[in-house]
Amino acid sequence: MSPTLVVDQENSEEFNTSSFEGPEKLLELWFSAPIKTNLSAGEKANLGLKAVSRNDWDDMLAQAQCKVLSVVNSEEIDAYLLSESSMFVFAHKIILKTCGTTTLLASLPRLLEIASSVGFDRPLRIFYSRKNFLYPERQLAPHTSWEEEVRYLQLFFPSGCSYVVGPTNKNHWHLFSDLADDYSLLEDSLDPEDETLEVLMTDMSPERSLQFYAPSLDVVRSARGDDYVREKNNLSGGHILGSYVADESGVRDLCSTSDKKAVLDAFQFEPIGFSSNMIYKDRYATIHVTPQEHCSYASFETNVSQFQFGRSISETIEKTVKTFGANKFCLTLFQAKGASQEKHFSAKLKSFSSYKREEFIVYDFPGYDLIFASFTAV
């Protein structure tokens, strides 16, 4: 099945223009073993979460205080570009990522109810994580503090564990994780090459930040011609500008796979701010940018492997921070224990050009290793 794009014109022009909380809240729930793809035409399969209606997702997202801008669908993934970040729905797994003062965890009861409606009793694995907030005093319940978030999560997952990774007076990262007693049902089917990279960047260079201030459609027409705009007449203005900004800023190149078959859905907010989702088979990448000088932030997350990108993890990280001109960044890398990991990866993390490594921490989780590292430009 070829990926398809559905644009929600009604929700496509909203944006908060003042100081903005870029760092996202990220929730990931795994419900069961992956359901097979490449089904024969007449075969009826349990699509799991992918069978959930758009109305149900809209209802859930309303609890988190965000809306859908557009959706890219493929056989393996439904990728939702949101007014505040992104959501990725697989048959057995959901990833919800929201920024600003959204109340992501307030959507958890509805999310679990929706999962139950398609046959999932409870998650086999849960991750909730976020970087330290820029404006913690502006957050709404249940996000007014990490302690409050943990208390709320433990109402649903009482055996979950809380971690604060990195120095609390500098860039650091919070994680809540839980495993069901029968997690082994899922562990046997894990992809041995599974890896998820997050690069969380602050203090962007002014030159790079300006790329994510919305140009006018007249500027796009002048640069690319009327045909460029005309061929995208099924898109909203924000999506037309998003496609142009993705090209000009290097975002499209950053998200391109080695076979050039990835599909990108990008949106440029007016007057400022940028979001994009990319899907490739059962893989994704997502980028979100808050370019204001006093609160600049950009994030890049992907589970596309180094083999599919055609470059090493270290090269992807270097390309990412160069694209956004970050003066500070931290990263997290979850890798399956069976992955063909880059040799001497920890040593390579010392040698990014123009950056000093401040922290390097490794956690050993069931089935996965977690690496956290933070860097400052020198």
Curated annotation (Swiss-Prot):
Entry-linked InterPro entries: AdoMetDC-like (IPR048283), S-AdoMet_decarboxylase_euk (IPR001985), S-AdoMet_deCO2ase_core (IPR016067), S-AdoMet_deCO2ase_CS (IPR018166)
Active-site residues from the entry: E21, E24, S85 (schiff-base intermediate with substrate), C99 (proton donor), S275 (proton acceptor), H288 (proton acceptor)
Entry cofactors: pyruvate
Gene3D superfamilies to which the protein is assigned, alphabetical: S-adenosylmethionine decarboxylase
BP-aspect Gene Ontology terms: pantothenate biosynthetic process; spermidine biosynthetic process; spermine biosynthetic process
Associated pathway: Amine and polyamine biosynthesis; S-adenosylmethioninamine biosynthesis; S-adenosylmethioninamine from S-adenosyl-L-methionine: step 1/1
Keywords linked to the UniProt accession: Autocatalytic cleavage, Decarboxylase, Lyase, Polyamine biosynthesis, Pyruvate, S-adenosyl-L-methionine, Schiff base, Spermidine biosynthesis, Zymogen
Modified residues (Pyruvic acid (Ser)): S85
Marked site: Cleavage (non-hydrolytic): E84, S85
Record note on modification: Is synthesized initially as an inactive proenzyme. Formation of the active enzyme involves a self-maturation process in which the active site pyruvoyl group is generated from an internal serine residue via an autocatalytic post-translational modification. Two non-identical subunits are generated from the proenzyme in this reaction, and the pyruvate is formed at the N-terminus of the alpha chain, which is derived from the carboxyl end of the proenzyme.
Entry keyword annotation includes Lipid metabolism: no
Cystine pairings recorded for this chain: none
Family membership: Belongs to the eukaryotic AdoMetDC family.
PANTHER family hit by this protein: S-ADENOSYLMETHIONINE DECARBOXYLASE, S-ADENOSYLMETHIONINE DECARBOXYLASE PROENZYME
Stated name of the protein: S-adenosylmethionine decarboxylase proenzyme
Species of the source: Schizosaccharomyces pombe (strain 972 / ATCC 24843)
Annotated gene: spe2
